[in-house]
Curated annotation (Swiss-Prot):
It comes from Protochlamydia amoebophila (strain UWE25). The UvrABC repair system catalyzes the recognition and processing of DNA lesions. A damage recognition complex composed of 2 UvrA and 2 UvrB subunits scans DNA for abnormalities. Upon binding of the UvrA(2)B(2) complex to a putative damaged site, the DNA wraps around one UvrB monomer. DNA wrap is dependent on ATP binding by UvrB and probably causes local melting of the DNA helix, facilitating insertion of UvrB beta-hairpin between the DNA strands. Then UvrB probes one DNA strand for the presence of a lesion. The beta-hairpin motif is involved in DNA binding. This is UvrABC system protein B. Residues 28-414 form the Helicase ATP-binding domain. The keyword RNA-binding does not apply. ATP binds at residues 41-48. Residues 633-668 form the UVR domain. The gene is uvrB. A motif (Beta-hairpin) lies at residues 94-117. One of its GO terms (molecular function) is ATP hydrolysis activity. Residues 433-595 form the Helicase C-terminal domain.
Length: 673
């Protein structure tokens, strides 16, 4: 590790097997400005470790693109551990629930947009863009959310607030600037994206921070002192000479731009009126007139309106059809893109634009939106491609397009440093598959193993989970209806042994790193289709490749082409690994991977609480006899702070104790209040 380098890789391991050769090939091609490369790495060969080494050698800001939030969360954890002193960030959709605006002409049903935003992920998204604007040592792990419209990087950077000690500036001007950046004044509840004023002291809680706020102390119009403080207690952490505060939203716009945008929105409305009058569509004319005029009034009075993103083209002064700014525009021109599980991620990138366009077409046709709403959209594939400087496609089963882009050259990584072989695959009849699978589950669980069970539908995964639970088998299901944070928590609980069987569909395929899994059972393996294709079967089998006892059972009444090809590839790779093991005297061993916390829900900061120590219970029990209401509230803040600190340092039992103590004080608070 070279301390003069920006990206510093921290690991106790050295590249081995065919990792060194893969790293050298990838780095050499990147330095030679080759645009596209393919890394074909089997499950368990250390593709993530290889890419971490590549980043450390090329020293470039990197975007790692994953095809779902679960895989993105896992990659974020891993890169955070590899680069603890660099800005490793997480950028995925911040919606826990999202119902887009839509209209169904057949039933004349208008569906208003409804959503629930995850505050933690919103903070992480803002932290990601702030890091890109302030630092060069940035690694961002993202889902396809990165190709959706985001606020202009020029406006976001240009509207920041820079304060320095000794600077002369009126306090009211600072407050007005904060409001323009969409911060709210709140002198009672100090939370993210708010500020409070107490005499000559101004406290600001940046939108991208979690446990750090800024205190600005003034004397008249002079900034006398700037400090970093604890937002819970107000305790000063350290004095600083200057600070730059970034907006609390990516969709900020300077006032002069907003006024110009309102003019162009009115002009577009006039054009649309004429169109509907010519077509004699008076109902649609009334709709668009009423909706747009109301939005313009809101923009004039409060600076924003519901569905403001549909006017994004006007606010960014783009031409019709021009692509919106997105996360890719925040990166410097020489950034490196890594597309993980590219055979899955690229089709997603292709599909995003068409799905969005079809829904909005109806809204525009029937007068619910102006045509400019079309330009609030994800990027087309060719627009994404045009923003790529250099890319590495990473997959165990790369698609033909990626290979063609790389000029037919593939960097292979087929050896597992752990010596683990591809799992033995057994074919069993599909008739009676559930009962047979149950017996196998009991056998593996009794030995401390975990089981992945894949089905073809969400409904079947839920019904099968209920059936297993009724038979005293601890099981949970995982599919796309489960929100981001909960998915991560479910996988962590499986690894910890809170339950033993995870039932799912395609979320149990690419990238999930669960070394405790000793059995993968594939129901209805002979049902040819997307979920039982050659690629899908190889990827699903790979989930058992991190355990020395790993096995796969396919339940099928016939051997399909996909099953046959999977068996051939697996046998070939087993033979290659066995030769390597014999040559180097390696005994296969199960991967050991630390179980860490990525994000905790607000409700349950710690997954596995222990019993609270008796003295803590006693202290909380007796507290109401001598504590005032203000003292109880201070105790709650102290407990919350200690709980978060313990959880962040992975002292889970202690964190659970603090959480339980906090809840006791909250009950006492209710009684006293």
């Amino acid at each position: 590790m070279n301390p003069s380098q920006l990206f510093q890789l921290h690991t106790e391991f050295e590249p081995c097997g065919d990792q060194p050769e893969a790293i050298n090939q990838l780095v050499a091609s990147i330095l030679q400005n080759k645009r596209s490369q393919v890394l074909l790495g089997i499950t368990g060969s250390g593709k993530t470790f290889t890419m971490a080494n590549v980043i450390a050698k090329v020293q470039r800001p990197t975007l790692i693109l994953a095809h779902n939030k679960t895989l993105a969360a896992q990659l974020y954890q891993e890169f955070k551990a590899f680069f603890p002193h660099n800005a490793v960030e997480y950028f995925v959709s911040y919606y826990d629930y999202y119902q887009p605006e839509a209209y169904v002409p057949r039933t004349d049903t208008y569906i208003e947009k409804d959503m629930s935003i995850n505050d933690k992920i919103d903070k992480m998204r803002l932290s990601a863009t702030r890091s890109l604007l302030e630092r060069s040592d940035v690694i961002i792990v993202s889902s396809v959310s990165c190709i959706y419209g985001l606020g202009s990087p020029e406006y976001y950077r240009g509207m920041n607030l820079t304060l320095s000690q000794g600077q002369m500036r009126r306090r009211d001007d600072i407050l007005l600037h904060l409001v323009e950046m969409q911060y709210k004044r709140n002198d009672f509840e100090f939370i993210r994206s708010t500020f409070r004023v107490r005499g000559d002291v101004l406290d600001i809680f940046p939108a991208y921070e979690e446990d750090l706020a800024i205190r600005v102390e003034m004397f008249g119009d002079e900034i006398e002192q700037i400090s970093e403080i604890d937002p819970l207690t107000g305790k000063v952490k350290r004095r600083i000479a200057s600070i730059t505060i970034y907006p609390s939203s990516h969709h900020v716009t300077p006032e002069e731009i907003r006024l110009k945008a309102m003019e162009t929105i009115r002009a577009e409305l006039d054009e649309r009126r004429q169109f509907y009058e010519t077509e004699k569509k008076y109902l649609e004319l009334e709709r668009i007139q009423q909706r747009t005029m109301y939005d313009l009034e809101m923009l004039k009075e409060v600076g924003t309106c519901k569905g403001i993103e549909n006017y994004s083209r006007h606010f960014s002064m783009r031409q019709p059809g021009a692509p919106p700014p997105c996360l890719l525009d925040y990166f410097p021109s020489d950034y490196l893109l890594v597309i993980d599980e590219s055979h899955q991620t690229l089709p997603q990138v292709h599909a995003m634009f068409n799905g969005d366009r079809a829904r909005k077409q109806t809204l525009v046709d029937f007068g619910f939106r102006l045509p400019s709403a079309f330009d609030n959209r994800p990027l087309r594939f060719e627009e994404v491609y045009g923003r790529i400087h250099q890319v590495v496609y990473v997959s165990a089963t790369p698609g033909a397009w990626e290979v063609q882009e790389a000029g037919g050259e593939i960097v292979e990584q087929l050896i597992r440093p752990t010596g683990l072989l591809d799992p033995i695959i057994e074919i069993r009849p599909a008739s009676g598959q559930v009962d047979d699978c149950l017996a196998e589950i009991r056998s593996h669980v009794s030995k401390g193993g975990r089981v992945l069970l894949t089905t073809l539908t969400k409904k079947l995964s839920e019904e099968l989970t209920t059936y297993l639970n009724d038979l005293n088998v601890k099981a949970k299901y995982l599919h796309s209806d489960i929100d981001t944070i909960e998915r991560v928590q479910i996988i962590r609980d499986l690894r910890l042994g809170v339950f033993d069987v995870l039932v799912g569909i395609n979320l149990l395929r690419e990238g999930l790193d669960i070394p405790e899994v000793s059995l993968v059972a594939i129901l209805d393996a002979d049902k040819e289709g997307f979920l039982r294709s050659e690629t899908s079967l190889i990827q699903t089998c790979g989930r058992a490749a991190r355990n020395a006892e790993g096995r796969v059972i396919m339940y099928a009444d016939k051997i399909t082409k996909s099953i046959k090809r999977t068996l051939e590839i697996t046998e070939s790779r087993r033979a290659l690994q066995m030769r390597y093991n014999e040559q180097h005297g390696i005994t296969p061993r199960t991967v050991k991977r630390e179980i860490s916390v990525l994000m905790e829900s607000e409700e349950d900061q710690v997954t596995h609480p222990t019993k609270l120590e008796e003295e803590i219970f006693k202290a909380a029990e007796e507290a109401h006899h001598y504590l005032t209401l203000d003292e109880v509230r201070l105790k709650i803040k102290e407990c919350e702070k200690e709980m978060k600190k313990a959880a962040k340092e992975f002292r889970f039992e202690e964190a659970a104790d603090w959480r339980d103590q906090m809840r006791r004080y909250q009950q006492i608070e209710l009684t006293l209040a």
